[in-house]
Regions:
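Charged, non-catalytic interaction/linker regions at domain boundaries
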Residues: 1-223, 227, 231, 236
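Short, charged amphipathic alpha-helical segments flanked by flexible coils
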Residues: 239
């Protein structure tokens, strides 16, 4: 049985959580951006894809808008990170409104992941998983760095994501007329997904599937694919 002192401590703990949640909910919604690169070839100028996905407006193009351009010194500050950013990758950026920086980053990355999962599931590699392979199966992947920006485009230095095991896609997808048709199909696919009654379950399983095929180690990929199956079937490892 809980002693009275323990009950009081627990109640104070619950109240402190409620207070923190209340503070967050009282914060105004603020616009944020996130920038990265993606394995589409950037040689063709212009915007290649722009769509509202989930809580974010996502855009793929050859160059960042001027608002989000940042000095090279920022990436240079990460040493080897700058050397790993592929120059032939297209630029990808997203915007959303959120109450905290962390919430904004999570929302946008989840929506970017959904976009890439639709593309990879529909048009991704048909290569099977082979033991000994040390590169991801997904052909559409983000670059090694994702950077958060505030509403005026200023870099938020405390929230930068870096993938230390980044593997470059040596032959990025070429943006041509066929690619434009594919992007339109992806857009229609996402629209249909949003209207589906099981959209949350489907989104979660698609993200898990895509995440599993982003991994370098095929053995870990198989574990991730099993988790995807568990999400879809509503089962766990002990069932």
């Amino acid at each position: 049985h809980l002693k009275r002192g323990n009950i009081n401590s627990f109640e104070r703990f619950i109240e402190s959580i409620k207070e923190e949640v209340s503070k967050i909910l009282r914060k105004p919604l603020v616009k944020y951006f996130i920038t990265s690169t993606i394995s589409f070839d950037r040689t063709k100028d212009g915007v290649h894809f722009s769509k509202k996905i989930g809580e974010s407006r996502l855009t793929v193009g050859s160059h960042y808008p001027r608002l989000l351009a940042f000095d090279a010194w920022f990436l240079n500050g990460f040493g080897d990170v700058n050397q790993n950013v592929p120059e032939n990758y297209a630029r990808i950026w997203a915007s959303t409104r959120a109450r905290t920086e962390e919430q904004a980053a999570n929302q946008m990355l989840r929506d970017i992941e959904l976009y890439m999962s639709v593309y990879n599931i529909t048009y991704g590699s048909r290569r099977g998983i082979t033991i000994g392979r040390r590169s991801p199966l997904n052909s559409v992947r983000l670059g090694p760095v994702q950077i958060l920006h505030d509403s005026v485009g200023k870099v938020i230095k405390d929230i930068v994501y870096y993938e230390p095991e980044f593997t470059v896609q040596n032959s990025p997808h070429i943006i041509d007329d066929n690619q434009a048709r594919i992007q339109r199909y992806v857009s229609i696919f996402i629209n249909c997904l949003e209207r589906n009654a099981l959209r949350n379950l489907l989104k979660a399983s698609m993200r898990q599937y895509s995440y599993a095929l982003n991994l370098n180690d095929p053995r870990i990929s198989l574990v991730g694919l099993w988790s995807c199956l568990e999400i879809l079937t509503g089962t766990t490892g002990d069932k």
